[in-house]
Amino acid sequence: DKVFSSRILIILFSLGVYGCATDSSEPMAIPEPTDWVTLIDGTEGLDNFNRVGDANWTEEFSSIRATEGNGASWLVTKDSYSDFVIRVEFWASDDSNSGIYMRCQNPEVITDRDCYEANIYDQRPDPSYGTGGIVHRAAVSEPAPTVGDKWNVYRITAYGDRLIAELNNEITADVSDSELSEGPIGLQWAA
């Protein structure tokens, strides 16, 4: 089936935004978001993003899909976010190199140094930052998960300086890092 031959297919991208601060006496307690925003929903999914690069992002069956492009490309949210939960359901091929970029500092030039990247890359040469890791920040837990050729759910929480990546209900990375506090979110397609 052609739908499943793509590098990455994202069927749902929801963003939970925190509306208030928590009690400072419990700094590690992370509340549930107060509001959820669906960024990919039916035929209006691409309207919430700017394109960086030339991947052929298309809307298909209430999802967003990319199958080709020259080099890495991103869909970048038009808004910036500081504290949030991202929930993404996706299908990726086993050779995919993709990721969810967060708190990006320059929405026109996306890098894994100027954003936090929750990786989707089963075949990464250095597996410490493979699928489930936060590149350059938090190595993936062992054993490293694989996501190729099946449906997966990524849930990423950014609250204050804390970043938690959960893949298919397993925590794969958990780190405190205060370098990046706010910015757009990007979805990557890489050749």
Roles of regions detected by a PLM:
Residues D1-L9:
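Bacterial N-terminal signal peptides that target proteins for export
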Residues I8-Y18:
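Bacterial N-terminal signal peptides
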Residues C20-A191:
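Carbohydrate-interacting regions of secretory-pathway proteins
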